[in-house]
Amino acid sequence: MSPSGDRSTLHAPPLWRQLQLAARLLRGVQSGHSLTAQLQDVDGAMRPGVQALVFRALRWWGLARALRSQLAPRSPAALPDALLCTALGLLSSQDPPAYAPFTLVDQAVEAAKRDPAMRSSAAFLNACLRRFLREREPLLRQALHGDLAARWNHPPWWVERLQSDHPTAWAAILASAQQPAPMDLRVNTARSTVDALRQRLSAAGMQSTACTGAAVRLARPRPVQEIPGFAAGEVSVQSAAAQLAAPLLLRGL
C-alpha cells in the first residue's frame, strides 16, 4: 500500500477492512503473540497495507494508550479497545499522514460497524475519535505531561534503562526508534551490480541511493514483488547495517 493523502489505488483493499485486521493483530501482540507469525496468516493482497498500519500504530502506541485513557477511563472490550488505540495511534502520529483525519475516523467506525464483535461499540468509537479531532492539542498536552510511555512510546523501565546506560544519547536513541525503518536491498553481486539494479529501479519509478558495498536504499518502501530482480534472486532485503556486520567482524579476526 502506498497511500498519498487519502488516495489509494483503485484495487486497494478498503481501509475499514485493513483497520479490522490491524486491530486484531495489535490485540494479538498485546496478548503476547508474535506479530511476524500473525502477519503470515493475512491474505497476500491485504498484507502490505495492514502491515504498514500496524507498524505505524505501534510506533505511537504509548501515546495512543494515554489518549484512550483520557477519552475512555473505563476500557472497552479488548477488540474495540485495540481498534480505538490503532486509530488514535494513526491520528496522533507525527509521521506524514497516510490518510486525512476524517477519512480515518470514518473508516475506523465503519470497521467497527462491519465486525459483529465490535458493532455495538461503533457509536462509542465514533464519539471518542471525533472528540479527539475537536480537542486534539489539549488532549495531547495532557497525555504527554509526565508520562514516559506516552512521550517516548516505550515502557518506562526501558526509558529509564537507556537514561542510565546512555546519559547523553538516550533521547536520540528513542527518537530514532520513532522513525520508519528504511528499506535496504542487498544486490547478489554474482548476478548483478549496484549500478544495474539502480537503473532498473529508476526505470520502474523507484528512487534509490547507493550505500556501502552491495547495499541500495529505497527512497520509499515497496512490496518486494514490485522490486526488479527480487523473484529471480538478484536482490534481497537486508538492512545496510547488517550487511556491514560480517566484513567488520572478519576485519577484527
Regions found by a protein language model. Give the residues of each.
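Class I Rossmann-like S-adenosyl-L-methionine
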Residues: 1-226
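SAM-dependent Rossmann-like transferase core, predominantly class I methyltransferases
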Residues: 218-253
